[in-house]
Amino acid sequence: SPASGFFGMR
């Protein structure tokens, strides 16, 4: 999911 990618980048 896009949310996982966002937090993963952070």
Swiss-Prot record:
Where is this chain's protein located in or outside the cell?
Answer: Secreted
Sorted keywords for this record are:
Amidation, Neuropeptide, Secreted
| Entry GO CC | extracellular region
Question: What is the superkingdom listed in this entry's lineage?
Answer: Eukaryota
Q: In which tissues is it expressed?
A: Expressed in the antennal lobe (at protein level).
Signal peptide range in chain numbering? none
Q: Name one GO biological process term.
A: neuropeptide signaling pathway
Q: Which residues carry this modification: Arginine amide?
A: 10
Specify the protein name: Tachykinin-related peptide 4
> What species is this protein from?
Acrosternum hilare
